[in-house]
Amino acid sequence: MANRINLNATSYHGAGAIAEIANEAKAHGFKKAFVCSDPDLIKFNVTSKVTDILTANGLDYELYSDIKPNPTIENVKHGVEAFKASGADYLIAIGGGSSMDTSKAIGIIIANPEFEDVRSLEGTAPTKNPCVPIIAVPTPAGTAAEVTINYVITDVERKRKFVCVDPHDMPIIAVVDPDMMSSMPKGLTASTGMDALTHAIEGYTTKAAWEMTDMFHLKAIELISKSLRGAVANTKEGREGMALGQYIAGMGFSNVGLGIAHSMAHTLGAVYDTPHGVACAMMLPIVMEYNQECTGEKYREIARAMGVTGVDEMSQEEYRKAAIDAVKKLSADVGIPSVLEAVKEEDLQFLADSAHADACAPGNPKDASVEDLKDLFRKIMA
C-alpha cells in the first residue's frame, strides 16, 4: 500500500517570517486578500502585524472577523457571502484553528459551489477543485492547521463537531513566525501546546502510522516536551521550539489521522464549548492508559522523547507508566485541569455516541466501543 504525504507548497519559519507574505502575494499575482482573523486578535493588534505589511506594500485586503473559537456552520455561511462580495482572490488566515478552519471551509465552498452546505463535506470530502489559495499564519502554537488537510466545524443545532478531510484545502503557504505567538495569553499557550502534544502522540500511535510519520511525531514530542513550559513563560526559546514542534506534528498527523482523544475532545467542545486544547489535555493520559496494550514499544520512545531517563532498563509496564506520567506532569505544570465539572452522568450516552461516530475514532490503535467511551468520559467527571 502506498503512503501519502501532503504538505504546503512553501513554508517559512522563524522570527520575522511574516515579511515574506507581501513577497509571496506579489509573486502569485494576487490582487486582494480576504483576511480571516478572530476579534480578539484584531483587538490586541496581532492581526495588524500582517495587515500593516500588506498596506506598506500597496496590497489591498478586506477583514473578516465573524469567527468563534469553535467555528460554526453560520460563521462559514457568512464568510462565503462576505468573500463573494469582497472581490478578493485569495485568503490570509491569521490565528489558530478557528480562523484557519473557517478559511478552509470558505475557500473550498467558493471553489466547489456545489457543496454550499458545509455539512456535505464531512468525512473525506469529494471535491474536485483546489480551494481558493490560502496563506496561513498561526498565532497560537498548537493546531497546526496551517499544514493539515483537515478542518473542524461545529453544528450548533445538533450539538456536534464534524471533521472534513480534503487535500484540496491545504494552504499553499504557511508562515510560522514565533513573534506572532508572543502576545498569546498563558492559558491559551498551554492548551494549544497540549493539543499539539496530543497530535504528536496520537499520530505516532494511530493505526496508519509509518516510518516517515513516526519520525515527524517523535521529533515533535521531543520539541514540545522541552519547549511548552518555556512558551507558557513567554521565553524566546520556548516560543521558537513550540512553533516548530507543533508544525512538525501537523506534518505527521494530517497524513495518518488521530484517535479517540480527539474524537472525545471534539464532543466536549461541541456540547460544553470546552476549549479544544483543554479537552485534548484532559483526555490524552486517560486514552493513553486505555490504549497501552495495543502500542507495542512505542511508549518507550514517547517516554524517551519526553526526557525520561533509563527507559532502556525499564520493563514494559514501567516505560508505559513513565510515558503516561510524563504527559500528566507536563499538563499539570502548565495549569491544565484534569476534571470538567460540566460533565454529568446523564450526558454520557450522548457524549459516547458522538465520539464513537467522530471521524478520528477509527484511527485509534485500540477499537473503542460506546461503553468504553462512556467509561473514559466518566474519568474526567468531578
Predicted regions and their residues:
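Glycine/threonine-rich beta-strand-loop-alpha-helix active-site module
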Residues: 74-179
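N-terminal small/polar loop signature for handling phosphorylated ligands or for N-terminal nucleophile
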Residues: 42-115, 229-239
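Short glycine/serine/threonine-rich phosphate/pyrophosphate-binding segments
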Residues: 18-21, 43-46, 73-76, 99-103, ...
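An N-terminal, well-structured beta->alpha segment
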Residues: 1-64
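C-terminal charged capping/lid subdomain of soluble metabolic enzymes
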Residues: 299, 303, 309-382
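Carboxylate- and glycine-rich phosphate/diphosphate-binding segment that chelates Mg2+/Mn2+
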Residues: 150-256
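Catalytic phosphate/nucleotide-handling subdomain of diverse soluble enzymes
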Residues: 267-306
